[in-house]
């Protein structure tokens, strides 16, 4: 049994906390929001983010970051990408040398063009940073539906340790040393999913969606390989797998936001309607900047930026 804290109590953090708890680990969930923590502790259910999914009595909840971080075997960082750097900075004083932090969010920082793991390493240099990614909607993981993901880490030892911690009968975990490729696939697919959703909102058919997914992964792979990612990463679970589920699923907030824009909503109206973080909106500008920096043609990413910021 490991002692684990999940930093961030959104839908994905809640689903992973439940998975880890079912695996027999001692799990604490942290949120900066006192009302959210009180509600979770009392109701044992996140009714706004993961309704109908009950949390065990053994799970603990806190707003005390020091208490959440210190003495834990590993930490799961599950805050929205725009809060990754700030949260990591606040965690830093309490993180022990070599303590494992698994980032499970997806995004690229617009100002620096850094991936999330790079931001965490920047703020917490003493940590052993890993990532978890793949086609995995929180709603399905919370319900115990079969899911397959990949853990990326710098060392095989860390990757295999996390594989053992997360793996269950319904949650299969592969390992990869290609953290950069995994993170690029996970963040850039959100931008392509906005395009796929917009096509749905405009009433276009399956032919259009198939084209967007296929040409979308080609764009992602071109950039990712130029930046140093491995080709097989983009044609595996954390590339095409994640892209398919995000472009096609009813659970996908990026697809839903795109769908609403296709129906005539503005970006702001669509984001308000979705009521959860739409990571693709925050990654779109960064994706365009990366394409220019590395001189890679990404026409879908270009058009998404035009729809979002010039429409």
Model feature map: region roles:
Residues 70-71, 188, 240:
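Alpha-helix C-terminal capping/helix-to-coil transition sites in glycosyltransferase folds
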Residues 4, 27, 127-129, 173:
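Hydrophobic anchor at the start of a short beta-strand
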Residues 83, 94, 119, 123-127, ...:
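Internal alpha-helical scaffold of NAD(P)-dependent oxidoreductase catalytic cores
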Residues 1-53, 60-63, 90:
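NAD(P)+-binding Rossmann beta1-loop-alpha1 motif at the extreme N-terminus of oxidoreductases
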Residues 196-197, 225-235, 243-311:
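NAD(P)-dependent Rossmann-like dehydrogenase/reductase catalytic/cofactor-binding core
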Residues 55, 62-70, 74-146, 162:
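Rossmann-like NAD(P)(H) cofactor-binding subdomain of soluble oxidoreductases
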């Amino acid at each position: 049994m490991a002692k684990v804290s999940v930093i961030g109590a959104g839908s994905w953090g809640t689903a992973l906390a439940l998975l880890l708890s079912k695996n027999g680990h001692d799990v604490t969930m942290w949120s900066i929001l006192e009302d959210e923590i009180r509600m979770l502790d009392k109701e044992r259910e996140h009714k706004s983010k993961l309704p109908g999914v009950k949390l065990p009595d053994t799970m603990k909840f806190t707003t005390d970051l020091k208490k959440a971080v210190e003495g834990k075997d590993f930490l799961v960082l599950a805050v929205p990408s725009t809060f990754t750097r700030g949260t990591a900075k606040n965690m830093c004083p309490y993180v022990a040398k070599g303590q494992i932090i698994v980032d499970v969010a997806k995004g690229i920082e617009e100002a620096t063009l850094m991936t999330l793991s790079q931001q965490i390493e920047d703020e917490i240099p003493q940590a052993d940073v890993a990532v978890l990614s793949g086609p995995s909607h929180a709603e399905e993981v919370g319900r115990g539906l079969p899911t397959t993901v990949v853990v990326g880490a710098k060392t095989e030892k860390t990757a295999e340790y996390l594989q053992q911690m997360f793996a269950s009968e319904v949650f299969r975990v592969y390992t990869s040393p290609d953290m950069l490729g995994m993170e690029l696939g996970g963040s850039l697919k959100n931008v392509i999913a906005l395009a796929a959703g917009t096509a749905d909102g405009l009433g276009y058919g399956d032919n259009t969606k198939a084209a967007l997914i296929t040409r979308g992964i080609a764009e992602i792979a071109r950039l990712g390989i130029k930046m140093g990612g491995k080709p097989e990463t983009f044609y595996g679970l954390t590339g095409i797998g994640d892209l398919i589920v995000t472009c096609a699923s009813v659970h996908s907030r990026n697809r839903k936001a795109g769908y609403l824009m296709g129906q005539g909503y503005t970006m702001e109206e669509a984001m308000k309607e979705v009521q959860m973080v739409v990571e693709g909106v925050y990654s779109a500008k960064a994706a365009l900047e990366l394409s220019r920096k590395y001189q890679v043609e990404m026409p879908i990413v270009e058009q998404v930026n035009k729809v979002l910021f010039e429409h």
